Regions:
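Metallo-beta-lactamase
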Residues: 1-98
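Accessory terminal helices/loops
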Residues: 56-61, 69-239
């Protein structure tokens, strides 16, 4: 969806737009600026321009490649305008934050759609779009750590950290984060603990509890399909 290779077919006499995957599986929804499934980078500004072209057609019917047709010129126009304005807003806010010297993680936390641009995010997500737009303009180097320049990730020293900190301290810290409602931080700490002791039962249990907490939040929140499928896959493959 939303990719540069997507083509649409316009039937002017019937005012029918055969949209393919241009809008994704649901209309309207926040699009995937860049998917997590290994596709090529999508250009946000070009997508906005394409939306402007489709809005100008003023279609009465949208026939997508997924789900049911959407019928009604006003409904379709408002839906396309909302998608365009939402993407434009996220794009512009990301650029403004970059120019202000903020990190990508700061912007992923801060940028939210205003109520008048609100869209479902079960396909694309705003915070992931922020990250995609950042990397589209900045590339892979985030200007945050010298270690980004070298093929030695933080995980390479996790076992050493586990040995120095001690599993008991790490487990206590991970559990404390979970109690405080910070399951992602729990995952960070359990990854360190498991690097030192891959079969540590307490670390494995805390990791699974953190994954379950994230899954419950996802299912009761944005209901993003990619996030839900990933979390389920991690629970399914847990030892």
């Amino acid at each position: 969806a939303e990719g540069a290779d997507n083509a649409v077919l316009w039937l002017p006499q019937q005012k029918v737009l055969i949209s393919g995957d241009f809008f994704g599986p649901q209309f309207p929804q926040f699009p995937n600026i860049f998917t997590m499934r290994g596709e090529k980078v999508r250009k946000p500004v070009e997508y906005i321009k394409s939306l402007d072209r489709l809005i100008a057609l003023n279609p009465d019917v949208i026939l997508p490649s997924h789900l049911d047709p959407t019928i009604g010129a006003e409904k379709i126009r408002k839906g396309m305008q909302r998608i365009r304005d939402a993407v434009q807003y996220v794009h512009d806010e990301t650029i403004a934050g970059m120019n202000a010297g903020k990190t990508v993680n700061q912007l992923m936390k801060e940028i939210k759609l205003p109520p008048n641009f609100e869209l479902v995010q079960n396909h694309g997500r705003v915070d992931w779009a922020v990250k995609s737009i950042w990397e589209y303009y900045m590339g892979w180097f985030r200007f945050e750590s010298t270690t980004e320049l070298y093929p030695i990730p933080a995980q390479d020293v996790y076992a050493d950290l586990a040995q120095i900190a001690g599993n008991e301290n790490l487990i206590a810290l991970a559990n404390n984060y979970l109690i405080q409602g910070e399951p992602v931080k729990t995952l960070h700490i359990t990854e360190i603990a498991l690097a030192g002791d891959p079969q540590n039962a307490s670390a494995l249990a805390l990791r699974d509890q953190a994954l379950v907490e994230l899954l419950e939040r996802a299912e009761n929140g944005l209901r993003n399909d990619y996030e839900i499928y990933w979390l389920k896959s991690q629970l399914d493959t847990a030892p």
